[in-house]
Amino acid sequence: MNMGIGYNTGLVTEEEAPKSWDDLLDPKWENQIVMTDPSTAGTTKYFVGALLSDSKYGEDYFKKLKENGCELESGTTATHNQVAAGAYKVGIMLDYVTQNLIDEGSPLGFTYLPSDLVSIFSPIGLVEGCANEDNGKLLYDFILSKEGQEILVENNLLSVRNDVEQKGESVDEITKSAMTVDLQSLADNSDEIISTFDSVFK
């Protein structure tokens, strides 16, 4: 899944929509931006951690975002629904959640940033010593099978298989524009990510 910029198509054209994280700092978006509180959503915590750890952004970026009137919602669904309802023109949003709402008729668009796209991995694995290891292996194999990956694509997620047709951006396209993120550092600094963000926004 990928974190980019979603927008209400009734209020913002594709041409007008922000194309970078820095575009959200433009005064024309003042008080028209929403994102999910990272203390309530792991995907947003990942996004915040990725930008905090990048010297191009860091804490200063979030200070500027706050100064431009970015508001917080308590959950991912609420963030997307608020943009769909027109309460905000743009939001820091997830591609698959946005696309699911588009499929339901919501007036939304989504920008895959050409650089510094925050791509979030969704790993699967077996817990060592689990009670039903054989069943776990069957599920693991099914998820990675062509049929299993086609189900993910039907739900607007990306497949890791080359023989499954994607609905939107390809894995190769996303890889080219994705930000490099140190996953171990994010895990090690999870509490610090939230405390730094909260010191700016709350």
List each language-model region with its residue ranges.
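Solvent-exposed loop/turn segments at secondary-structure junctions
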Residues: L11-T13, N31, S39-G42, Y96-Q99, ...
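Periplasmic-binding protein-like
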Residues: N31-T36, K63-K66, L72-E73, E104-E128, F142-Q166
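An extracytoplasmic/periplasmic, membrane-proximal ligand-sensing/linker region
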Residues: G58-D60, V160-K202
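Substrate/cofactor-recognition hotspot
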Residues: L139
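A ligand-binding cleft/hinge motif common to bilobed small-molecule-binding domains
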Residues: K89-P107, N156
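A bilobed periplasmic-binding-protein/Venus flytrap-type ligand-binding module shared by bacterial periplasmic
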Residues: G4-L11, F121-E133, I151-L152
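Extracytoplasmic ligand-binding site segments that recognize negatively charged/polar headgroups
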Residues: M1-A87
